[in-house]
Each structure stands twice: as C-alpha cells, then as structure tokens.
Amino acid sequence: MIEKQKRKELLILNVLKNTEMPLTSTRIAEELKQLGHEMSERTVRLYLSRLDEDGLTTSSGKKGHHITERGISEFDLAKIFERVGF
C-alpha cells in the first residue's frame, strides 16, 4: 500500500498527466476537489516543489507546472504496483 504522501503526489501527477497545458496550484486544487480529494493550494504548491526537485514535474513560472516523461513513468509504475498489491 502506498503511504499518504506518495498517494497525494500521485493524485497531483494524475491531474497533470491528463492535461496538455501547464496548471497552477489553484487549478490543480480545483481539479482534485472535483475528483473528491480536498487539498489546499499551499499543500499542492509544497508537493509541486518536491516533485520539481525530483524531476517529475517542471515549472513554467506563473503559467503553472506540467508533468515530465519521468513523472509519467513514475505514475504508470506506481499504478502497476498498486494494482498488483505491493
């Protein structure tokens, strides 16, 4: 089972994976809320900062963030492990 922090990172990566354009933390928080996951803009920003450091997302300044190829691979791999039950 994936720990709480990793699950939140995967939720953010999922939102970014499903869009072509960069998204701001505000927009990501709104998308997560629509999916039934409450997360504040500040929390999203903190996770995005960590994801940027890990190379899973990149910042486009005030335009927002987008997922990298590495982020897509990480997301897909995590989903496979989650389905298998590791």
For the regions a protein language model found, what residue spans apply to each?
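Short alpha-helical segments that sit at the start of domains
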Residues: 1-19
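Short acidic, hydrophobic short linear motifs in intrinsically disordered regions
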Residues: 22-32
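Alpha-helical residues within the helix-turn-helix
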Residues: 30, 34, 52-53
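Short amphipathic alpha-helical interaction segments
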Residues: 37-52
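A short, conserved structural fragment
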Residues: 52-61
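Accessory beta->alpha helical hairpin/"wing" motif in late/C-terminal subdomains of nucleic-acid enzymes
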Residues: 62-76
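Short, amphipathic alpha-helical interaction segments positioned at domain boundaries
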Residues: 72-86
